[in-house]
């Protein structure tokens, strides 16, 4: 493959063997595509806003004299961009404007005559917009809407696994689940009658719903049963003979052939052989004794032909008397139902006997009573209710997906249809349920991913929007029916509040709208790819059983089997697999390579879980020869969710890549295939908690997906178009675009502004720094600037540490970690955290709070870091307790004596009635103020600091825009100059003319003149753009801020806190190997090798065997080899060897092993080789893809190439004594992460503080400045030691004995070291609770 200039800077050696068929798709496409569909203006769309409007409009008045129709909609432009919204704490959204048409009909004239039409554009609230990285900014914070995995609409057949009834009988049920509307359930009871439930209310016999659908008893029996007829002749009875129906029965009489020979004797079981005989003889009728008819069930009503009186009703059981009556009435042929116990049960016939209703009206009344108990039913009410349940589009929506699943389950060819139910639908569901009860079909598996679908942002937002619209619809209907509409416009009818409220509620407080996890780029991407089974319309943690949480065979390639949280949510929150995507119906699908006649093609098909079951699919690692043909005769495959061996001709598909089954977080773990799944789960979860370090360090052992994640996460700056870097500084990169990528008539300059030191949601630091230099060529997609945790465009969450696996004086007991002082000195694990502290000045009842530097009872020294407005300077270094913003609050008037009042009135003295309520630095925090922002309410005068900040912002904007303008202007003049030079002008002539007149020269050539005019137009356009941009920015900066009611001013102070590594911090590798730092040891005491190189970290070898995460050992060995290669290159550079030698060595390194990667060093220029070698000095970055990584031989070969022992173990010496350790130790490089569980955030101590009001016990937790809980088990411990006084002290004066506490304080002050324990307050609480039960308890007074 050809590498771009940027990619040649550092090439990762890839150990992957399988060729890449498919690029990893854009990781955030699920979120972006879903929201795009929601917001896209497409009149044909059947989803999104368009569908929501079309489903609610037109709205007609109750009388039908007026109608409000929907025409179209469009989204306006957002008022502020994303950054401004974050700073101001507002929502990034755009106004929605809808064109509506009010049509008035003439009351007097014929129906449908239009009297008047009015069209108008109506504002319908703000819709939050998605940023380009798939997040939403709501009230200034970035949030993510997590997709939901819910049960797909459609029909499901299931059984209760024999749990409902004591007999253990399996009861089958069917459930029709719509997208919205009432659920319809059919179920069997232990007596095998069929019942129906609507919305899980009380059950009714299933025949009631059939009667309500206007089916008679005869029709019902006809639909569910086959019939057998009997012919009554004078002396004998003949029966219709269908041989197949006799299977398994016992002959009640001799069955004879045509000649009278006995085929089956009485009492014998009828076998398949007998049935074949009867079929060959082709007998249509057979003589039976009359008693044989007894117990059969009539299929029709039979009436006396003469009198018309009904003798036998349908579903009546035949008795000898009834047979005689029928025969007397002249009825010769009787049709009966065919039933048997095997596969034609009498279920519906029995159900009809339970059913008390006889006609449609009675059935409707019965349903009405069940749905609305206690209301008197009328015919109209009952009919309306029943029609609205399943047959009205407003109340019931099966949705396209639901209809597709419904038709597919019932085995229909056509998968489309109405989104409401029909008579046939209901009958077919009942037929299918009875088929399943008869053993002719299987029940469904509800955990199959073909029965669970994904609801993404767009769909959930659309549902909420529709909820708002329906509320509006009710109000509009009311208004259309009131008063005169002649002077009414559409705007007067619509109130946008309910819509805004519904949308706002969804984005602000829905369970699936979550505060974005922004620890590092990986955690952002993973959060956006998360799939949750919780949330509205989903499961709840408590009710979810083991089956739902389990890994299902259909998860393969769709949901990751590894990445899920530990704890109560395990298995309910999943992560999308690497290549997975959703199809048009919302089901997850995964790509497979097509195989034809045993050879693999490059065609890739995406299959959903339903389709996948029908194919035979081989693994990604199946053996292939050079032509792409399968080599093995028997191939391990997946078919119908089972693993089997198949011959190679039967194989139809194979996986596209080995890492297809895992999520991106799991595919970041090298040697994942050697780790136990539980540890891999911890590994993938802990990578998301890594804090970005001060200097990112790429992993020496990676998996090759690091670049994809870094680029797709959006934290890096990526070139939109190719070109040459023109200018670089810390906050901006300018690229001159290549001619061929330019749009005709544009300046051809791309300007990228970088983010500097901003705060993330988790208080980590977001900062971008350029990776390119002026003059370097860039191609589209190259990384121009690194963000947090990225290094040259690759994700870099931690640091490569030199580790040794050995015990060291008990300091690494039980997963503790011993680290070297050098790690702290070199700031390897130092992180920067940015905290935002707010000070709000409100308008109180007693007067306004004031931000000022004049604070009562505070010394000069405490105000040293504040300016005259009372706000801290930028750059001040502050510690816990320092004042950041001075603020005073008016105190309530104290009772004054008349003399004081007089003095006050004369001198206007007011100073004493304010109290200090300043913003102070929290305890234990010390850092540097890096930014201050002041927001002032409209109409409140800005203080000096606010004005200064405003001026600074304006100056910055002006400087930025001016520089931008200069760059673009330069580009314009360069193009004009080239045009003039190629049309007869020379350098001297151009130099003599003023630059501004270049654009007005006469060239005497029409084409060239047109080009020059176009350039001049562009120049004018750029100037105009500059003016409008500046004006817009100026207006935004100078206008007052929209603050919450009662707030006059907000000051935000940003503190940067630098945290070095220290004992108590949590470190982890990528294999679930986590630990806490026990101590930091001086470099000279650490174990070192022969050359005196000390190790950075000492880990306990006992942490490996029981955890079964051997991946960490392989990583250590490969890391050692990678570092050894780097050292060798460094030596060659130091010795200034010939560049050909360096080329040969690099070629040898990249060619090692059976890799798919082909790097041809001969294609590199000498400069490029030197730059590559320079970047490899610290170690050769390697990639060992998941399930396709480096094998033992390759690691050994690389170790050998680096002149290191192939065992991966070396001699170490004790740094304190200089003695050699007893045996060789495994030493190598492991990638270690610093997790966001820092001891500084957890360390906490209190002597006295706040107490709970009721129990008078200290509060708990660091945030409340609480005490330590002395719990039940701790009490036992003291009891066990018999430490009575200590225990008494713990339970009284140290806890909730109020008088004892104060007395204790006094005693300590008086140096009288005694204590008296009184009555604990919690005992009084207990007494009061018992009294509240009406039991009086009084303490004996002693």
UniProtKB/Swiss-Prot annotation:
Disulfide bonds: none annotated. Keywords: DNA-directed RNA polymerase, Nucleotidyltransferase, Transcription, Transferase. One of its GO terms (cellular component) is DNA-directed RNA polymerase complex. One of its GO terms (biological process) is DNA-templated transcription. Its EC number is 2.7.7.6. It catalyses: RNA(n) + a ribonucleoside 5'-triphosphate = RNA(n+1) + diphosphate. The RNAP catalytic core consists of 2 alpha, 1 beta, 1 beta' and 1 omega subunit. When a sigma factor is associated with the core the holoenzyme is formed, which can initiate transcription. Belongs to the RNA polymerase beta chain family. DNA-dependent RNA polymerase catalyzes the transcription of DNA into RNA using the four ribonucleoside triphosphates as substrates. NCBIfam families: PRK00405.1 (NF001616), rpoB (TIGR02013). This is DNA-directed RNA polymerase subunit beta.
């Amino acid at each position: 493959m050809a590498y771009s200039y940027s990619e040649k800077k550092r090439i990762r050696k890839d150990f992957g063997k399988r060729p890449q068929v498919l690029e990893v798709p854009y990781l955030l496409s699920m979120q972006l595509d879903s929201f795009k569909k929601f917001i896209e203006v497409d009149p044909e769309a059947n989803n999104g806003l368009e569908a929501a409007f079309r489903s609610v409009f037109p709205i007609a008045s109750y009388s039908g004299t007026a109608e409000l129709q929907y025409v179209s909609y469009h989204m306006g432009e957002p008022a502020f961009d994303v950054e401004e919204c974050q700073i101001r704490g507002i929502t990034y959204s755009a106004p929605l404007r809808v064109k509506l048409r009010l049509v008035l009909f003439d009351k007097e004239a014929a129906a449908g005559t239009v009297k008047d039409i009015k069209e108008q554009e109506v504002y319908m609230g703000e819709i939050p917009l998605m940023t380009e990285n798939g997040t939403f900014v709501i009230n200034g914070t970035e949030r993510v809407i997590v997709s939901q995995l819910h049960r797909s609409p459609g029909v499901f057949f299931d059984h209760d696994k024999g749990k409902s009834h004591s007999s253990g009988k399996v009861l089958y049920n069917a459930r029709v689940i719509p997208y919205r509307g009432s659920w319809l359930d059919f179920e069997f009871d232990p007596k095998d009658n069929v019942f129906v439930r609507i919305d899980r209310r009380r059950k009714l016999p299933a025949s009631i719903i059939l009667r309500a659908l206007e089916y008679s008893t005869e029709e019902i029996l006809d639909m569910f049963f086959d019939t057998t007829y009997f012919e009554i002749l004078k002396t004998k009875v003949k029966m219709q003979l269908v041989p197949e129906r006799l299977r398994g029965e016992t002959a009640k009489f001799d069955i004879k052939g045509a000649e009278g020979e006995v085929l089956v004797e009485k009492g014998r079981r009828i076998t398949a052989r007998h049935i074949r005989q009867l079929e060959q003889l082709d007998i249509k009728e057979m003589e039976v004794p009359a008693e044989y008819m007894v117990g059969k069930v009539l299929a029709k009503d039979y009436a006396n032909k003469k009198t018309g009186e009904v003798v036998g009703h349908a579903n009546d059981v035949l008795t000898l008397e009834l047979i005689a009556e029928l025969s007397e009435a002249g009825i010769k042929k009787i049709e009966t139902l065919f039933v048997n116990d095997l596969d034609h049960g009498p279920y519906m016939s029995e159900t009809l006997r339970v059913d008390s209703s006889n006609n449609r009206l009675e059935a409707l009344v019965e349903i009405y009573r069940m749905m609305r108990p206690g209301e008197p039913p009328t015919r109209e009410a009952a009919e309306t209710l029943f029609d609205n349940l399943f047959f009205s589009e407003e109340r019931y929506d099966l949705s396209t997906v639901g209809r597709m699943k419904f038709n597919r389950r019932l085995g229909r060819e056509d998968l489309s249809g109405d989104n409401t139910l029909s008579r046939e639908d209901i009958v077919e569901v009942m037929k299918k349920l009875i088929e399943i009860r008869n053993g002719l079909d299987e029940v469904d598996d509800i955990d199959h991913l073909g029965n669970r679908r994904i609801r993404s942002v767009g769909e959930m937002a659309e549902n909420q929007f529709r909820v708002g619209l329906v509320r509006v619809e009710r109000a509009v209907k009311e208004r259309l029916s009131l008063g005169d509409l002649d002077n009414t416009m559409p705007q007067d009818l619509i109130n946008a509040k309910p819509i805004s409220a519904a949308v706002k509620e969804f984005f602000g407080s829905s369970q699936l709208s979550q505060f974005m996890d922004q620890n590092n780029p990986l955690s952002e991407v993973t959060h956006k790819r998360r799939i949750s089974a919780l949330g509205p319309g989903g499961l709840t943690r408590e009710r979810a059983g083991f089956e739902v949480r389990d890994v299902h065979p259909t998860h393969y390639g769709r949901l990751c089997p590894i990445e899920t949280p530990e704890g109560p949510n395990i298995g309910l929150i999943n992560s999308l697999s690497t290549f997975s995507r959703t199809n048009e119906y919302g089901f997850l699908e995964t790509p497979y390579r097509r195989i034809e006649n045993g050879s693999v093609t490059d065609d890739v098909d995406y299959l959903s879980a339903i389709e996948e079951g029908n194919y035979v699919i081989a693994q990604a690692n199946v053996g292939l020869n050079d032509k792409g043909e399968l080599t093995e005769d028997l191939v391990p495959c997946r078919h119908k969710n089972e693993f089997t061996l198949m011959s190679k001709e039967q194989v139809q598909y194979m996986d596209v890549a080995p890492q297809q089954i895992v999520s991106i977080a799991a595919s970041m773990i090298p040697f994942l295939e050697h780790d136990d799944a539980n540890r891999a789960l911890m590994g993938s979860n802990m990578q998301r908690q890594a804090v970005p370090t001060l200097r990112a360090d790429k992993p020496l052992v990676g998996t090759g997906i690091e670049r994809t994640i870094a680029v797709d996460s959006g934290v890096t700056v990526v070139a939109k178009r190719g070109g040459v870097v023109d200018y670089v500084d810390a906050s901006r990169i300018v690229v001159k675009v290549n001619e061929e990528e330019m749009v005709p008539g544009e300046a051809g300059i791309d300007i990228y502004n970088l983010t500097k030191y901003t705060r993330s949601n988790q208080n980590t630091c977001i900062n971008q720094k350029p990776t390119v230099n002026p003059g370097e060529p860039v191609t589209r997609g190259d990384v121009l600037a690194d963000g947090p945790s990225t290094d040259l465009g690759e994700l870099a969450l931690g640091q490569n540490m030199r580790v040794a696996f050995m015990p060291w004086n008990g300091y690494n007991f039980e997963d503790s970690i011993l680290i070297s002082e050098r790690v702290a000195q070199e700031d390897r694990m130092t992180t920067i955290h940015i905290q935002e502290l707010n000070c709000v000045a409100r308008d109180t009842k007693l007067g306004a709070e004031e931000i000022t530097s004049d604070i009562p009872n505070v010394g000069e020294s405490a105000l040293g870091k504040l300016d005259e407005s009372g706000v801290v300077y930028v750059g001040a270094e502050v510690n816990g307790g320092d004042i950041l913003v001075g603020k005073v609050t008016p105190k309530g008037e104290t009772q004054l004596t008349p003399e004081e009042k007089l003095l006050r009135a004369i001198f206007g003295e007011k100073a004493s009635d304010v109290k200090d309520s300043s913003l102070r630095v929290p305890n234990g925090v010390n850092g540097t103020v890096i930014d201050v922002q002041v927001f002032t309410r409209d109409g409140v005068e800005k203080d000096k600091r606010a004005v200064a900040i405003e001026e600074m912002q304006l100056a910055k904007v002006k400087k930025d825009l001016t520089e931008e303008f200069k760059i673009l202007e330069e580009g314009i003049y360069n193009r004009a100059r080239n045009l003039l030079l190629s049309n007869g002008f020379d350098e001297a002539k151009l130099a003599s003319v003023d630059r501004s007149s270049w654009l007005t020269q006469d060239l005497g050539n029409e084409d060239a003149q047109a080009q020059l005019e176009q350039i001049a137009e562009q120049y004018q356009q750029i100037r105009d753009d500059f003016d409008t941009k500046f004006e817009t920015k100026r207006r935004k900066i100078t206008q007052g801020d929209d603050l919450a009611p009662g707030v006059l001013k907000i000051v935000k102070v940003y503190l940067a806190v630098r945290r070095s590594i220290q004992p108590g911090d949590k470190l982890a590798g990528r294999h679930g190997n986590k630990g806490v730092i026990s101590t930091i040891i001086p470099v000279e005491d650490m174990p070192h090798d022969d050359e005196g190189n000390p190790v950075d970290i000492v880990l306990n070898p006992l942490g490996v065997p029981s955890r079964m995460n051997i991946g960490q050992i392989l990583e250590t060995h490969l890391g050692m080899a990678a570092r050894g290669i780097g050292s060798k290159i460094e030596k060659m550079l130091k010795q200034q060897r010939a560049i050909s030698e360096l080329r040969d060595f690099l070629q040898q390194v990249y060619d090692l092993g059976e890799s798919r990667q082909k790097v041809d060093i001969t294609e590199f220029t000498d400069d490029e080789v030197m730059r590559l070698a320079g970047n490899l000095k610290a170690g050769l970055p390697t990639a060992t893809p998941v399930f396709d990584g480096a094998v033992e031989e390759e690691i050994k070969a690389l170790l050998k190439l680096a002149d290191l022992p192939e065992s991966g173990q070396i001699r170490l010496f004790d740094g304190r004594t200089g003695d050699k350790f007893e045996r060789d130790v495994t030493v190598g490089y492991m990638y270690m992460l610093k997790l966001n569980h820092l001891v500084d955030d957890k360390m906490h101590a209190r002597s006295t503080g706040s107490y709970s009001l009721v129990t008078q016990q200290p509060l708990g937790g660091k945030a409340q400045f609480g005490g330590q809980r002395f719990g039940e088990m701790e009490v036992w411990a003291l009891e066990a030691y018999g430490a009575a006084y200590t225990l008494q002290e713990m339970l009284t004066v140290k806890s909730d004995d109020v008088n004892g506490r104060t007395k204790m304080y006094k005693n300590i002050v008086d140096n009288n070291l005694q204590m008296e324990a009184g009555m604990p307050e919690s005992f009084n609480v207990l007494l009061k609770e018992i009294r509240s039960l009406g039991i009086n308890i009084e303490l004996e007074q002693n």
